[in-house]
């Protein structure tokens, strides 16, 4: 039986085309394309597997779960560089946010969702959230 709060994430399930743009770490005008699949692991977690083609394939995985005791969603992140991170997550109506506040730097993801599209932006802060710089825009379009 799915947790009622996790069931609210059902709209993320499916196959998505991805577009990454306006990334500070790429040449101006560069646009990347990829895809993501979101599916349930049992009835307890969501798994997002994403891939982008750049000079070589770039992959990452998110596992989304929930703590009933503190009423929070959590995202575990891992990518093909071996990077592992933990984000807090909220889904409030059509706004999807993820936030990481770690000693090395902070990151945030803010997206607006509709049934077939998610427009999101990621930012980073190297001064504990006092100032933020844009990382990139990412768009999900349901296949």
Which role fits each region the language model picked out?
Residues 31-35, 57-61, 82-86, 104-108, ...:
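Short, surface-exposed coil-to-beta transition loops
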Residues 123-126:
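Conserved Ser/Thr-centered positions that define the repeating blades of beta-propeller domains
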Residues 13-17, 42-49, 70-75, 91-99, ...:
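Short, hydrophobic/aromatic-rich segments at coil-to-beta transitions
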Residues 51-86:
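Helix-adjacent hinge/juxtasegments
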């Amino acid at each position: 039986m799915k947790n009622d709060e996790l069931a609210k994430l059902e709209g993320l399930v499916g196959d998505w085309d991805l577009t990454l743009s306006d990334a500070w770490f790429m040449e101006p005008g560069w646009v990347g394309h990829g895809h993501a699949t979101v599916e349930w692991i049992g009835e307890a977690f969501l798994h997002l597997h994403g891939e982008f083609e750049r000079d070589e394939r770039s992959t990452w995985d998110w596992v989304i779960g929930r703590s009933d005791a503190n009423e929070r969603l959590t995202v575990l992140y891992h990518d093909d560089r071996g990077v592992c991170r933990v984000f807090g997550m909220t889904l409030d109506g059509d706004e999807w946010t993820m936030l990481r506040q770690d000693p090395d730097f902070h990151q945030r993801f803010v997206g607006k969702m509709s049934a077939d599209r998610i427009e999101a932006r990621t930012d980073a802060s190297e001064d504990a959230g006092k100032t933020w710089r844009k990382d990139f825009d990412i768009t999900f379009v349901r296949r």
